[in-house]
């Protein structure tokens, strides 16, 4: 299901059809280097999809993962993470397949997410973590 669109991207819910693709790019060393995990497995992807189906965005707590695709395609190029930290406050993160790096997709997805969270859900404070 589409959540929102940007000029070049569609941000959508994740589902079982995304499991193999999540494992494919999230298990790359170049991608996981900047994430909180070292090894990403099929079991991790199944658990993530299950959690996404049980979670809704509210102002109290919880987290959600969204898929990133280019417009007109269902092929996952990455994903966005939203975690509710406090009322009107959320943190964000994203993972992008390294073959799509250096095209501005991460920036475009994050800017779209910031607008979506503010305009659709009334959030006004965002926290981002950087893994080096």
Residue spans for each PLM region:
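GNAT-family acyltransferases
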Residues: 1-99, 112
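Conserved GNAT acetyl-CoA-binding A-motif
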Residues: 120-129
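Membrane-interacting alpha-helical segments
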Residues: 75-76, 130-132
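Conserved acetyl-CoA-binding loop-helix of GNAT-fold acetyltransferases
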Residues: 102-119
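Short glycine-rich loop/turn motifs that provide flexible caps or phosphate-binding loops at active sites
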Residues: 77, 92, 103-108, 127
């Amino acid at each position: 299901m589409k959540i929102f669109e940007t000029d070049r991207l569609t941000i959508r819910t994740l589902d079982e059809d995304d499991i193999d693709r999540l494992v494919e790019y999230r298990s790359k060393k170049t991608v996981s280097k900047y994430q909180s995990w070292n090894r990403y497995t099929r079991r991790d992807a199944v658990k993530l999809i299950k959690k996404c189906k049980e979670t809704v965005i509210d102002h109290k707590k919880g987290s959600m993962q969204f898929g990133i695709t280019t417009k007109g395609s269902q092929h996952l190029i990455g994903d966005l993470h939203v975690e509710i930290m406090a009322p009107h406050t959320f943190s964000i993160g994203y993972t992008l397949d390294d073959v799509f790096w250096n095209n501005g997709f991460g920036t475009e997805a994050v800017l779209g997410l910031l607008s979506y969270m503010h305009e659709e859900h009334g959030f006004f404070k965002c926290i981002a973590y950087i893994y080096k």
